[in-house]
Amino acid sequence: MRKINGKDYVPFDLRNPLHRDYLRQKGWVRNFKGIEHLITMITDSSIYTQNFIDPEILLRDWTFLDGEPCGVEKVNLEKGEIHDGGQ
């Protein structure tokens, strides 16, 4: 995580195909209309800051298609690894 303006942000690189595929597999975001819509939604909003996403927004607005909260995922941008925040 990184502190930006006093808040913790979770790194997520939407330009990385591995990360985009992971989002697809998770089925994240209400009214999900494909990864391009997701990227537009995030980059056009205040939750997207230097490739970091506010985990409070993740928990509030992002859910699995089955309705379960997605939780906070942590992504290692350098290695391209994705880790479940709860593990």
Where are these regions (language model features)?
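Structural boundary micro-motifs
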Residues: 1-87
